Amino acid sequence: MNTKSNFIQLILSLAIGFVLTIFFLGYENIGLTKTNWFIKYDTISDFLALKFFLNDKWHFPLGLNSNYGDLNNSIVFSGAVPIFSLISKIFKNFLPYNFHFFPIWITICFALQIFFSYKIIFNFTKDNVYSLISSFFFIFTPILIYRLGFHLSLGAHWLILAYFFLELSNNKKNILFYKIILITISSLIHFYFTIMLFMMSLFFSFYRYLEFKNLKFFIKENIFILISLVLTMYFVGYFVIPPTDTLGYGYGFYKSNLLTFFDPSYSDLDTWSLFLPDIGNVKGEFEGFGYLGLGIIILSFFLIIYIFKNFIPNIKLNLKYILLSIIFLLLAFTNSINIGNFELINLKLPTFLYAPLSVIRASGRFIWPVYYLIIIFSLIAFYKLKIKFRYLLLLLIIQLIDLSP
């Protein structure tokens, strides 16, 4: 698509994103100084980190938040969306008291979620209407709405979709440049996305090496990405604390359940389904919450049908995405695997494995790329099975009704 088409799509996505933000926050909370909707600890904590950062002078590294209590570390270790915090600090003398950019950020997350999901589906269908309707399945997902409710920086799921768009697109021109930009930007939003994107980049790069045996390009590609990433992380303050301080308790606790895609509840007090019952899980698995929604669960059955209609060709064609999903699922389920409340496996990891894995203590979040791959390929399968369009609308309505409580 040409630049004009992309611009129009982006503007429309922003308009839809703004409308969704009004529904999400309420019209009265759209202002950039309104804090009444800060009811979650994480949102309040992020706001305080931003306030301290804006009221401090510039330091080096640029993200240093020296007055933030006893922490005295970088803004990147808060959830205050570092890239927006840095931009806000440039203009801090012109900003109102109690300023925050959170409604703008939520609008951008909704908008880019629509933008990239539309482009992914359009890449396979070349159908504008189908792609637009499909994009709303990526918006009305519990994992996105749940995160935007209190973990603002972790609402940037569009980063995952943007990366998949690069890999799934037929146009590979300048893909290395776009990958560097995307992975670098992710480090200015939240490091969990950086780990996910870098892992995906390394995986696909290695897969291409196995296919084409181009060792020179494999090395060059990953060195360029790594240098760009490390330099960015250095300038914004990732290394102001010792690496050992990033290790901690959590891996094997903040994980995902084997039934996470079908379990609408991550605690006894919350449910995301009007129709499906709470399956049950164990403490800590809220980080791996991955309920698809009834509409998407039904949609995924069409993916299963499509796969088995042409089993061998489908497996060969999508082997790399199957392997990638297995890797992320293993990380999300960890060494302590549960089916509902029942503990299936609990392996004791040696220290040399547990220590590096402790960096991703909330490993349940690694379910997200798999979650979006399920939606992407389910929508593509639905289209290729030539099912009447009105049934897709029906599934979207079912999804909305199911999430209504």
Question: At which residue positions do the language-model features occur?
Answer:
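Signature aromatic-anchored transmembrane alpha helix within multi-pass, membrane-resident enzymes
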Residues: 202, 223-227, 326, 376, ...
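Start-transfer (signal-anchor) and selected internal transmembrane alpha helices
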Residues: 1-30, 220-227, 305, 309-325
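Periplasmic/ER-lumenal interhelical loops and adjacent helix-loop junctions
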Residues: 40, 232-304
